[in-house]
C-alpha cells in the first residue's frame, strides 16, 4: 500500500519576499513539514520510531512556478524508493493543480549508539 501524505500549508507573512512570492527557504520548510507528517504516520503504522531513526544525507529541489500569498498550498509526500539502508522521499508543492516545486530527499537509517547505518525496517517497505 503506497503511503501518500497531503499536508495543507499555511504560508506565513515572512515567507514572502518583496516580489510577493514565497522564497526558496520557505519552500524547504514546507517540504520539512510534509516529511514530518510522513514519518509520524509511518511510525504510527509500524512502531519503528524508537528503534530506527533516519537522517537526511541529500536534498535536491527544483522550482517551477511562483507561490503567491493568495495561493492555496499543499505538500504531497511519498516514499519513492527504498534501498538496503536508505529511502528516497519524493515531494511536490502544489497550488491547486499547479506543481510549483519538487523535492527528492535521500535518508539513511542510522543507529546513533553504534554510529553505523542500519537496514531499513522491513515493515516500512510495504508503504512504497
Regions found by a protein language model. Name each.
Residues 1-74, 80-128:
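Terminal targeting signals and extreme-terminal segments of soluble enzymes
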Amino acid at each position: 500500500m503506497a503511503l501518500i501524505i497531503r499536508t495543507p500549508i499555511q504560508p506565513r507573512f515572512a515567507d514572502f519576499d518583496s516580489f510577493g512570492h514565497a522564497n526558496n527557504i520557505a519552500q524547504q520548510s514546507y517540504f520539512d513539514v510534509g516529511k514530518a507528517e510522513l514519518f509520524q504516520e509511518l511510525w504510527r503504522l509500524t512502531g519503528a520510531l524508537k528503534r530506527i531513526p533516519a537522517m537526511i544525507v541529500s536534498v535536491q529541489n527544483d522550482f517551477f512556478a511562483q507561490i503567491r500569498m493568495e495561493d492555496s498550498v499543499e505538500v504531497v509526500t511519498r516514499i519513492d524508493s527504498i534501498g538496503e539502508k536508505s529511502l528516497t522521499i519524493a515531494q511536490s508543492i502544489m497550488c491547486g493543480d499547479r506543481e510549483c516545486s519538487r523535492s527528492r530527499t535521500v535518508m539513511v537509517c542510522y543507529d546513533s549508539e553504534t554510529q553505523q547505518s542500519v537496514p531499513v525496517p522491513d515493515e516500512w517497505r510495504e508503504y512504497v
